[in-house]
Amino acid sequence: MNHIVWHQHAITHSERAAQKGHRGAILWFTGLSGAGKSTLAGALEAELFRRGLHSYLLDGDNVRHGLCKDLGFSLEDRRENIRRVGEVAKLMLDAGLLVLSAFVSPQRAERDLVRALVGEGEFIEVHVATPLTVCESRDPKGLYQKARAGEIKDFTGISSPYEAPVSAELVIDTSEGDLDSQVAKLVDYLISGGYIPA
């Protein structure tokens, strides 16, 4: 692949940020199934849209309908799933978007690989640290029940490990407080970090 050369864009990161009125970033929501990642990311997306900011939500289930529909849930397939999503998120970041990625992404090494794809401060890890007992009691898709019955093997949190972030930029337990206050915490972080205007 020595013949493949990266094409440099004529538009810079700072020019895209100036046009959009905010900096791009990847907010990576990680946590157990049922933790509230997609709900929280979706509510943040709605708030950013209300403010006239440019964002897009990449959801774990949705990408498996297209981009990653050929992948299963083996360790290798999970790694490839996160690699692909990381590359897509990087492209969206390059376009100047606030990319909201909601994936269980149970392995710390894979999340760190995505972080390494982008510049300093462009990857914001949001650990949705809702306890397993709460996630299992919610069980919106019936997955925990199936995993406990042995119908799903290698299910994160039950028969497969989840490696919690060591130093996430934000930690939110969705069983504490309400959705509005949790979104406000995310927005405050983005404002204080200079990603979006107040």
Swiss-Prot record:
Tell me any Pfam family this protein matches: APS_kinase
Recorded E.C. number(s)? 2.7.1.25
Catalyses: adenosine 5'-phosphosulfate + ATP = 3'-phosphoadenylyl sulfate + ADP + H(+)
InterPro entries tied to this protein = APS_kinase (IPR002891), P-loop_NTPase (IPR027417)
Q: Which UniProt keywords apply?
A: ATP-binding, Kinase, Nucleotide-binding, Phosphoprotein, Transferase
Question: What does the entry list as the binding residues for ATP?
Answer: 31-38
SUPFAM superfamilies reported for this sequence: P-loop containing nucleoside triphosphate hydrolases (SSF52540)
One GO-annotated biological process of the protein: sulfate assimilation
Active site residues according to the UniProt entry: 105 (phosphoserine intermediate)
| Any one GO MF annotation of this record | ATP binding
Pathway recorded for this protein: Sulfur metabolism; hydrogen sulfide biosynthesis; sulfite from sulfate: step 2/3
* Keyword Transferase appears in the UniProt entry: yes
Q: Does the keyword ATP-binding apply?
A: yes
Cross-referenced PANTHER family: ADENYLYL-SULFATE KINASE 1, CHLOROPLASTIC (PTHR11055:SF63), BIFUNCTIONAL 3'-PHOSPHOADENOSINE 5'-PHOSPHOSULFATE SYNTHASE (PTHR11055)
What does the function comment of this entry state? Catalyzes the synthesis of activated sulfate.
Family indicated by similarity: Belongs to the APS kinase family.
The name this protein carries in UniProt is: Adenylyl-sulfate kinase
* Organism of this sequence: Shewanella amazonensis (strain ATCC BAA-1098 / SB2B)
